[in-house]
């Protein structure tokens, strides 16, 4: 039964968008019930009479509403006519204006009723950032590293205490540069690592190995990094990789060892550009959770560098496998089975895992652009350190010779 002064539409609105305490929990249910009740009444009316077509029903409702408005207007006019007999014209006009202002305020309150939302404001802002590509891998990595410095938990306990990573190595103090040389000499003698390439050189060298990206996406090859990424996704209760969860990740499992994170991220950027279309369409659940940028940086880039590692270090000599091609990778793109050989890839995975410390302390502080080499040498002169002995140039020249 519609109360006096209320239209049918107003009653429905109050029933569905009630803001009384406790109504938020039942909001969706009330909406569904309201829709079903209205639909049932309309279907019953439409089944028997053509006179109650949707257009005619709307006309009838509109006419009822118009009649009610006219009645309200007439009653208002009659009321003020009575008042005009007992008060001066100025007071009557003031009363009319006050009544109109009160009515406008009531209408504004009805229109501006806020709907209850299920998402918290911070969640909505995070989703907006993700949709606008504001939470890219570099920003997440930076925040995670800063947090880790505060907590003194950069890497897991896989390293001894005296070899725990310190991000302050990037500050290039004299002690840190001396320590860097010690780490470099230790790992170079133990693993015979190749020289660090500049970014343009690296991208040129790894280009022939990038087709592994499509093979991973199509499930043609198993991936150790994809396996770790999938586990992180399964253990999460979030719809996407959040900053907090990124901070909790063990980055050892997503780092391409001696290549370092800086060069790994450059490869990831190139992969994201080249395979943007394939990465956007038909995304697996793991890729959706990580996001394209982070998936390229921490899954596809290290897998590409794993293939490059097999080529650079000629790991077939350390394997019992009889496959020992000595061709340049551009000449053996049709020999994927060589670089996809499980035995060779396991050797590469082990090597990269064992050289994570080298990658962070040495590779990430080495110049990644050619013009940075001059800055490095200027810094060594400022600290009164021997340029030939401590500069990265020495290791590039010695290794090539």
Curated annotation (Swiss-Prot):
It comes from the Eukaryota. The modification Phosphoserine is found at residue 23. SMART domains: RTC4 (SM01312). It holds the Pfam family RTC4. Coiled coil: none annotated. Residues 35-48 have a biased composition (Basic and acidic residues). It is found in: Cytoplasm; Nucleus. InterPro entries: RTC4, RTC4_C. Belongs to the RTC4 family. This is Restriction of telomere capping protein 4. It comes from Saccharomyces cerevisiae (strain YJM789).
């Amino acid at each position: 039964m519609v109360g006096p002064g209320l239209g049918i539409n107003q009653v429905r609105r109050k029933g569905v968008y009630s803001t009384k305490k406790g109504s938020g929990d039942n909001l969706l249910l009330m909406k569904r019930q309201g829709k079903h009740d209205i639909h049932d009444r309309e279907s019953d009316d439409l089944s028997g009479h053509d006179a109650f077509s949707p257009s005619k029903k709307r006309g009838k409702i509109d006419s009822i509403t118009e009649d009610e408005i006219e009645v309200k207007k007439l009653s208002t006019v009659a009321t003020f006519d009575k008042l005009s007999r007992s008060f001066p014209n100025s007071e009557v006009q003031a009363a009319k204006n006050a009544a109109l202002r009160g009515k406008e305020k009531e209408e504004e309150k009805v229109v501006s009723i806020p709907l209850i939302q299920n998402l918290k404001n911070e969640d909505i802002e995070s989703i907006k950032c993700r949709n606008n590509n504001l939470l890219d891998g570099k920003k997440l990595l930076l925040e995670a590293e800063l947090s880790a410095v505060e907590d003194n938990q950069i890497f897991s306990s896989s390293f001894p205490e005296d070899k725990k990573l310190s991000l302050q190595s990037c500050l290039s103090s004299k002690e840190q540069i001396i320590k860097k040389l010690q780490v470099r000499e230790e790992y170079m003698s133990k693993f015979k690592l190749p020289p660090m390439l500049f970014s343009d050189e690296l991208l040129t060298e790894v280009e022939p190995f990038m087709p592994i990206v499509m093979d991973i996406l199509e499930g043609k090859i198993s991936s150790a990094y994809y396996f770790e990424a999938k586990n992180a996704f399964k253990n999460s209760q979030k719809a996407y990789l959040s900053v907090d969860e990124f901070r909790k990740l063990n980055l050892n499992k997503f780092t391409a060892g001696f290549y370092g994170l800086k060069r790994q991220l450059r490869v990831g950027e190139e992969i994201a550009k080249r395979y943007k279309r394939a990465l956007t369409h038909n995304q697996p659940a793991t890729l959706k959770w990580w996001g394209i940028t982070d998936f390229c940086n921490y899954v596809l880039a290290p897998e590409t560098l794993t293939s490059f590692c097999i080529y650079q270090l000629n790991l077939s000599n350390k394997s019992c496998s009889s496959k020992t091609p000595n061709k340049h990778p551009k000449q053996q793109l049709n020999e994927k089975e060589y670089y996809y050989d499980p035995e060779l890839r396991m050797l590469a995975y082990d090597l990269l895992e064992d050289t994570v410390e080298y990658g962070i302390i040495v590779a990430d502080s080495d110049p990644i652009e050619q013009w940075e080499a001059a800055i490095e040498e200027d810094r060594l002169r400022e600290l009164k350190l021997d340029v030939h002995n401590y500069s990265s140039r020495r290791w590039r020249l010695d290794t090539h010779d």
